[in-house]
């Protein structure tokens, strides 16, 4: 009578030590701050996208969108404020799945260019810790006329908050570092009221 082979996995080799050697597995590149900034520049649309762990540079983002055809340049800077729902904020900490976030940001920018006839769009977002008073997002819009620039700037911001794969942890004064509340950027409306 024949027997079927065992489906059990083979035994592991005996270890000569009670401690297994530590294996270092590096983080994926999108979680490694040394691989940043990560940028996209789409020409001829004049679209500049950046994810960075460094302070934002508003003049750089305006420079990428300026055009002789533009009669209006609008810059929005989203800044870490010192309180949230009456709790004192120590800092915000942002994380992202960068490969997808870059794709989503470029899609938002392309949609805005097509819809509003823009001359250029820059979107930059900070990752990592962002202290009170520092910018976490910069949006620069260049358009032939101010109405299109203002409308596009607000739409781009709201689409970023609604769609981009970036999450934030609000850390409050008096809490241990690394603690806090994780939130999606879309958890508040344009006036700061909670939507959840």
Swiss-Prot record:
Its EC number is 2.8.1.12. Pfam families: MoaE. InterPro entries: MoaE_sf (IPR036563), MOCS2B_euk (IPR028888), Mopterin_biosynth_MoaE (IPR003448). GO terms for cellular component: molybdopterin synthase complex. Keywords: Cytoplasm, Molybdenum cofactor biosynthesis, Transferase. Signal peptide: none annotated. It comes from the Eukaryota. Residues 183-196 have a biased composition (Basic and acidic residues). Substrate binds at residues 145-146, 161, 168-170. GO terms for molecular function: molybdopterin synthase activity. GO terms for biological process: Mo-molybdopterin cofactor biosynthetic process. Pathway: Cofactor biosynthesis; molybdopterin biosynthesis. It catalyses: 2 [molybdopterin-synthase sulfur-carrier protein]-C-terminal-Gly-aminoethanethioate + cyclic pyranopterin phosphate + H2O = molybdopterin + 2 [molybdopterin-synthase sulfur-carrier protein]-C-terminal Gly-Gly + 2 H(+). It is an enzyme of class 2 (transferase). PANTHER family: MOLYBDOPTERIN SYNTHASE RELATED (PTHR23404). Heterotetramer; composed of 2 small (MOCS2A) and 2 large (MOCS2B) subunits. Catalytic subunit of the molybdopterin synthase complex, a complex that catalyzes the conversion of precursor Z into molybdopterin. Acts by mediating the incorporation of 2 sulfur atoms from thiocarboxylated MOCS2A into precursor Z to generate a dithiolene group. HAMAP family: MOC2B. Belongs to the MoaE family. MOCS2B subfamily. This is Molybdopterin synthase catalytic subunit. It comes from Coccidioides immitis (strain RS).
